[in-house]
Amino acid sequence: MSHIRKEKQKMKVIYPDYLKQFQCSGKECPDTCCKGWGIQIDARTWKKYQEEKGSFGKQIRKNSNKRDRTLKFQEGVCNFLTKEGLCRLQQAKGAEFLCKTCREYPRHLEIYGEQKEWSLSLSCPEVAKLILTRERPIAWLAIEKDVESNYKGEVEEELVELYYKMREWLVEVIQEPTKPIAIKVAEAMALAHDFQKYQKKERKENWEEVEERIQSVWNRYQKENETGRLETKLKKFQGETELKNIYVGNYLKIFHEMEAIEEEFLKFVRQVEGNMGENKETIGKERRLIKDAKEQSAKREVFYQNLFLYFLSVYFVGGIYDGMLYTKVKLAVFSFLIIRELIEQKELKEGRWLREEETWKIAWQYARQIEHSSYNLERLEEELESKEAFSLEMMLYCVLA
């Protein structure tokens, strides 16, 4: 990465319209954000911790790793977490004394060229509840700020704008109100597959030509959608339950190779692997016996739409740095498939619809397992990028089964 002298410049700051609705539930939280990941201390906070005087300063340094500037954990839990689930650092010195990660979580900042984008992490139980129950379409707000930045010129502005435009189109596909979520996920995946053909990181082309090609893909999608041709194309992938069971069963094996972040979640995944012989028809028969099945189905459509939108919106624009926009969408599809399968298999086994908070828990535990380990996230993206098991055709069979 090139180092450029910091200078004041106008920077657009983008955030989802629900960002400021988040409020930490504190003691009422069903879990804690102070376990299961390595919390690295930023340079400014590390210096402050090293200079802290008295017995409290000694306590901080005793519970910090000097080599990699991280907080020490015991059995996966931060040493500064109290029995009441509160942070001793914050209790003693206030929120401003915390390191950048602890101070901002579950808020997360990404920088795309000369733009900043804030999001909320699904790995937080309160965020999961906020995002997954949302009934209104997602919208992004933007403000301009004068900030110091050393990112000027690192990414072409045209590329960033193109990615935001493609994300806008994909979000439009997912938020179409009349189609089932599985159909919309399949359409978004096919659309991203075609976008990828015309956007390669290593190709230096006239931006107008690239934009025209991407626009032509979107225009073709709209035309095929209006004429019903798109629906016809997808029909051959529908109802293949046996194929879905084989493919998704294999997808679950990826978790065997991951760093363990959420032990309870990984144990649940292993249990589900043993139930993959059950088919979709059986699940359907079980559900028809449940009194409020129609109402529950409508709620679940909202849940899955919000789930997919989360992974799409958080990761897609990051493709400006590696050119892997299609892989970013496949990550959202993979997350949709795994969480849907885990929920359905648990419902099949127990013969009931899961309560909302149970589905939220599966989602935020999955997010922790993936997002709280850079190794796990990078490994998953490598698999999605390179393995035939994650081809467009195979994943469409899984989505539409």
Each predicted region: which residue ranges?
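Short, charged/polar micro-motifs that form catalytic or ligand-binding hotspots
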Residues: 24, 92, 156, 160, ...
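Internal, well-ordered alpha/beta segment that forms a basic, Gly-enriched binding/recognition surface
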Residues: 85, 93-194
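Short linear interaction motifs
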Residues: 14-15, 83, 320-322
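General N-terminal leader/first-domain-start detector
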Residues: 1-56
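Hydrophobic, aromatic-lined core segments that form the binding pocket/scaffold
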Residues: 180-401
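Membrane helical hairpin/interfacial module
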Residues: 37-84
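Local cysteine-cluster metal-coordination motifs and their immediate loop/turn environment
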Residues: 21-39, 72-108, 121-128
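Short, compositionally biased low-complexity segments
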Residues: 21-28, 137-142, 240-244
